[in-house]
């Protein structure tokens, strides 16, 4: 898949040149959600002909010590969005003293998700922005093309009921200040915080709400919409923390938006 996008040629060429002997023991892939980080992991797995294991949920010292005792080499995947600062400190030894014949690949949406000590010890591959023409090869839906920034985001938006997500987002923007608070809090019930299939995908919802707020700000100079945009941005940043209770966090920001637009 990756090779079809000229904007990511540098990543494909990097992988083509590498062998087991020359591949970095600690690699950091940085790019927006849906940019292809997991696809690159599959390419690495095939290139190195090794088994791959996501260890994001098991990052404690005892578990990492068990990995040192494994006789067979592995590719270990760590997702930055799923680990705490304490867990990042734990994996420093893992990075500084690599396992024999094994490799670590860390996935992050941006460098701010990781400690500087980790950033400095990993080789980095950064995804370039995708062009509108590259994304247009996936869809002609103009609204999707205005919202999405990566192929994965295009696919996700197309798979969801975008019309209903837009309606919900516009309802928040236009009416959250006049609705009563109990009704406002029911918005949380519509989002798939636990991956529910019959609810709206959180990533699709957040990107759509962001886009529609930007469009609103362009046509309405009410400073409250700029403040609402900041609240949504803060929510998007905070919800990336691995230990946050997603629905409680979202409800807290719904209350803030309700109070902002009510006054």
Say what each PLM segment does.
Residues 1-49, 100-103, 109-263:
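Charged, glycine-rich active-site and insertion segments that engage polyanionic ligands
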Residues 47-57:
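Conserved catalytic segments around the Walker B and adjacent sensor/switch elements
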């Amino acid at each position: 898949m990756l090779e079809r996008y000229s904007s990511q040629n540098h990543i494909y060429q990097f992988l083509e040149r590498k062998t087991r002997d020359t591949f970095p023991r600690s690699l950091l892939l940085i790019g927006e959600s849906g940019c292809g980080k997991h696809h690159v992991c599959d390419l690495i797995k095939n290139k190195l002909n090794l088994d791959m294991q996501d260890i994001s949920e098991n990052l404690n010292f005892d578990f990492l010590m068990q990995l040192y005792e494994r006789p067979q080499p592995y590719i270990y995947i760590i997702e930055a969005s799923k680990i705490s600062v304490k867990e990042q400190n734990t994996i420093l030894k893992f990075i500084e003293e690599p396992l024999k014949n094994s490799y670590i690949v860390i996935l992050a949406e941006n460098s701010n998700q990781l400690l500087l000590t980790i950033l400095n010890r990993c080789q980095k591959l950064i995804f370039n922005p995708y062009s509108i023409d590259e994304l247009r090869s996936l869809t002609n839906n103009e609204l999707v093309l205005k919202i999405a920034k990566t192929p994965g985001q295009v696919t996700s938006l197309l798979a969801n009921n975008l019309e209903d997500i837009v309606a919900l987002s516009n309802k928040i923007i236009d009416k959250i200040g006049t609705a009563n608070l109990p009704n406002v809090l029911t918005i949380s019930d519509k989002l798939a915080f636990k991956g529910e299939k019959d609810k709206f995908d959180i990533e699709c919802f957040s990107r759509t709400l962001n886009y529609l707020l930007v469009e609103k700000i362009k046509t309405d100079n009410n400073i409250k919409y700029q403040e609402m945009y900041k609240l949504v941005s803060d929510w998007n940043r905070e919800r990336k923390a691995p230990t946050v209770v997603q629905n409680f966090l979202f409800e807290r920001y719904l209350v803030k938006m309700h109070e902002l637009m009510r006054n």
